[in-house]
A protein has these predicted regions:
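Conserved alpha/beta-hydrolase
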Residues: 105-127
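An N-terminal hydrophobic leader/cap segment in hydrolases
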Residues: 7-65
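Alpha/beta-hydrolase active-site loop
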Residues: 131-152
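Alpha/beta-hydrolase
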Residues: 91, 120, 185-186
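Primarily recognizes the serine-hydrolase "nucleophile elbow" in alpha/beta-hydrolase
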Residues: 147-151, 155-189
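Serine-hydrolase catalytic-loop signature spanning alpha/beta hydrolases and amidase-signature enzymes
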Residues: 95-103, 115
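A short loop-to-beta-strand scaffold at the N-terminal edge of the catalytic core in hydrolase folds
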Residues: 68-79
């Protein structure tokens, strides 16, 4: 009888340990604290991580689309000053929002691309309660691709660039859309 009681106590301790560990992992990944947009932007400017003058002078359009599960998702479309059918979709990592993609803006813009910088769900001005590390985000990126095709035509040259969680997301998007011509996966997870 004493062994049964000890076994039950050990089982309860193990269950509590696994529940606590699961809660910790959930809070530190799926609902982790997001970076402040203004502070991140200021840090990127101070560290010369992108050409702010070029970014500010470029023609920008804020776009909001409704995701398959009803969230308002935001992006900024930057049309190149030289007309082109080349588009790149920049997808940031977890917790940083669109600011994390600005360091790649110059490279693509100066090489003749129109640039769509997205705010993944739960980031920036996009709605959402959780980051799903590509599980739902891949459908969001596919939605942005379809938006670009519907607006600019099926003959656009379309690439994806993702960093960290964004890299995982763009890799998961590949099987969803045959229009993707290239993908840059930068440090997936």
């Amino acid at each position: 009888m004493i062994y049964l009681i000890i076994l039950i106590i050990i089982a309860i301790i193990v269950i509590i340990f696994f529940l606590a560990t699961g809660l910790y992992i959930f809070k530190s990944t799926v609902t982790r604290e997001l970076h402040d947009i203004e502070k991140s932007y200021t840090r990127y400017v101070e560290n010369n991580l992108f050409d702010e003058a070029l970014y500010n002078s470029a023609s920008k359009e804020d776009i909001t689309l409704k995701s398959f599960d009803g969230l308002n998702l935001t992006s900024t479309l930057i049309m190149n000053e030289n007309p082109t059918n080349k588009f790149i979709v920049l997808v940031h990592g977890v917790s940083i929002c669109y600011v994390g993609s600005l360091k790649y803006f110059d490279i693509f813009y100066k090489n003749g691309f129109n640039v769509l910088i997205v705010n993944q769900r739960r980031h920036g001005k996009s709605e959402g309660k959780y980051s799903t590390y590509g599980f739902y985000e891949k459908y969001d990126v596919n939605m942005w691709i379809e938006y670009l095709k519907s607006r600019f035509g099926n003959d656009i040259i379309l690439g994806l660039h993702g960093e960290s969680m964004g890299a995982g997301t763009v890799m998961e998007t590949i099987p969803l859309n045959d229009s993707i011509k290239f993908v840059i996966e930068d440090c997936g997870y």
